[in-house]
Amino acid sequence: GTSGTSEEFFWNPDHEVGAKPPERPHPPEIERKDFRPLNSTRYIRQFVPRGFAVVHSASPGTGYSQGCPTIGADNESLAPKAVIDWLNGRARGFTAATGGDPVEATWCTGKVGMIGTSFNGTLPLAAATTGVEGLEAIIPVAPNTSYYHYYRSNGLVRHPGGYMGEDIDVLYDFVHSGDPTRRDWCNQNIREDELEKYLDRVTGDYNDFWAGRDYLNDIDGVRSAVLMAHAFNDWNVMPEHSVRIYEALKEKGVPVMCYFHQGGHGGDPPFWLVNQWFTRYLYDIDNEIEAQPRAWIVRESDKRGEPTPYADYPNPEASLVDLFPTGKGARVGEL
């Protein structure tokens, strides 16, 4: 993005409940050093030797992409859809944003998968909600599935773990890194006239603005097979974000599986599981992944790559346990 994480440019939460918060200062822009976004080569190393092609695309308002980041609005769902349409020959592509030579993805089979972590884990789900033909499988890792649940909680303003005072407009500043000549327009029309106007830090209530950034409201469009991945100790994007989508997709009858580990923010499923998931739905190879347990849970003290399989999540064989505090009240007690 074009902004750092200095808290002097976050919201100041030190004010009376129900009062208008102090105005947030906007950060100075960080100068862009390279006009070609740096993409990790990890997926290239993992997937290309197995016969997959890897495509890196930039979300609106980042890299070479036009438009503005909106932090969960429709353009961030339609942008990856456009890439998938191009991969399937339904949209035109060019070597430059304005002109250039036509480019066709003649090498693509038409079967596409998406994987990413955190903000980049939200984008596969966003694309899937459009119901775009050809997006066969996704693996969202620690995805933010509702910006209300990320920044609000039952009418209260909350902040993701470690970022006191962050809000949706702060994330906009962090993500926004596209065409510098468009920056002022995006800041005025998206950051000031939309995000800051409707985020409502006074009441923390759920409104149309937040509803438009809740992917559960668009879940009926999902047709892709979904492998959700999250950590139980993620205090940034809470595991509830994946659980709510997992439960909704089960009710819809969409192929869905989940992987949970004991770490913090991020963490892909073991690669053998990732490979099986994409092999089944992109190569259309019957590797019996559907017959395997639906939930893979890394138990306490176990290695992240050695999850325990369960029929579902929550475990159908689990039962409630009553816990009671003990001790004399003068020191740390036990349960």
Residue ranges and their predicted role:
Residues W235-H241:
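Conserved alpha/beta-hydrolase "acid-adjacent" motif
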Residues D268-L335:
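C-terminal, loop-rich substrate-recognition/catalytic regions characterized by aromatic stacking residues
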Residues R50-V55, C108-V112, E133-A137, R223-V226, ...:
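Loop/turn elements at helix/coil->beta-strand transitions in domains of secreted/extracellular proteins
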Residues V222, M228-H230, D234:
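Short beta-strand/loop motif that positions the catalytic acidic residue
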Residues G4-K33, P37-R45, P49, S77, ...:
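Accessory cap/linker subdomain of secreted extracellular hydrolases
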Residues V48-Y64:
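Conserved alpha/beta-hydrolase
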Residues D34-P37, G63-A82, A91-F94, H265-P270:
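Catalytic nucleophile-loop/oxyanion-hole region of alpha/beta-hydrolase
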Residues L249-G266:
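Catalytic histidine neighborhood in serine/cysteine hydrolases
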